[in-house]
Swiss-Prot record:
GO terms for biological process: mRNA processing; polyadenylation-dependent RNA catabolic process. Keywords: ATP-binding, mRNA processing, Nucleotide-binding, RNA-binding, Transcription, Transferase. This is Poly(A) polymerase I. Adds poly(A) tail to the 3' end of many RNAs, which usually targets these RNAs for decay. Plays a significant role in the global control of gene expression, through influencing the rate of transcript degradation, and in the general RNA quality control. Belongs to the tRNA nucleotidyltransferase/poly(A) polymerase family. Transmembrane segments: none annotated.
Amino acid sequence: MPKARAKKSEQTRRYDKNVIKAAQFDISPRDFSRNALNVVEKLQRQGFEAYIVGGCIRDLLLGKKPKDFDVATNARPEQIQNIFQRQCRLVGRRFRLAHIMFGRDIIEVATFRANHSDARNENQAKQSNEGMLLRDNVYGTIEQDAARRDFTVNALYYNPQDNTLRDYFEGIKDLKAGKLRLIGDPVTRYQEDPVRMLRSIRFMAKLDMFLEKPSEQPIRELAPLLKNIPPARLFDESLKLLQAGQGVKTYRLLRQYGLFEQLFPALSAYFTEKEDSFAERMIVTALTSTDERVADKLRINPAFLFAAFFWYPLREKVEILKNEGGLNNHDAYALAGNEVLDLFCRALAAPRRHTAVIRDIWFLQLQLLKRTGSAPMRTMEHPKFRAGFDLLAMRAEIEGGETIELAKWWHEYQFSNGEQREQLIQEQQRLHPKPKKKYYRPRRRKTTCSAE
């Protein structure tokens, strides 16, 4: 009996060591989403453990305003559904989650996970030959759940009931040091989910942190494992990486660790030692523009970003088809567009709504060459004209020469009145008159007279 009491006392001491008063970091329930607090409170009233978890706590500790609030609990998905009824929707097969709906606001609730080696059957956990977790639904305790998190700075739990934090892997200490550290063996954790390599880059750029050496070293060697990730998931991850406001910084890090070519293998042929090819300069120019738009809280369109990324590979393919296949400009663009988008979507499965816009932006580059007659007004009426013009302006910055003159003309045309526009068109017609059609005299048909 005394032995059991001693064991319990040891657990209590270990537990208390990991429980920290949130008030010392100026954190209180008012910093959290009302809906997330309601979910935690309802689960706790039903006798379950429940905490607000992960990135929102990390962001609050860094003085940032969180965007999302997630909850972790020891309630199973079916139990969560019984509590929240029609307000709850269960999602995911690989990683079973509950979404609690508050109108347009969704609170994601996950059941505490244990090590997948504790699984009793393949319905709970399953791994591929490369070590990737195909299913991860082994449930456990809060301590086990913390060990399943990716980085120490994300393994933080908040209990609004007593305003305390739980930190099992010194995440707060790492956060103060600006250090990203994987929980567990880095090789194993990257093999379990190769997307963790991309998450490490995203957090380095977003949080301005460094990746500790043991977590950093395996990335370049394990980068090819990203080929095992479904292209649709990689597309979503690419948006998180490149459209969060740190696109240029993220791109540099992805190149540094050999990850960019895994996401965009069709672009790797255009990489140079000095990183100064037209394609590389376009990537940086497009990402700089995206970062500025995010900072200004303007709308961003992923289709524009990828249309810019693949513009020079498209141009190269167009010239090949024209020179070797004898195709006209329009047909060469259509066929080249199909081939380039096919290569893009093999790695990142972009939805059709995006690929359709990418095509529009590319074809507008042809239309922008037409500056006489009624063509300019028809081009300006195209729904994607502004995106097409923005790509032209970026090309002018990179290519110089005639492209600068073309971009200037269209800038002036957009902001001119009717009379000024007509003058601009007439000037173009004077500079580039249509060749006169040659008049061919019809030949007289020869008639053959039969001899009588």
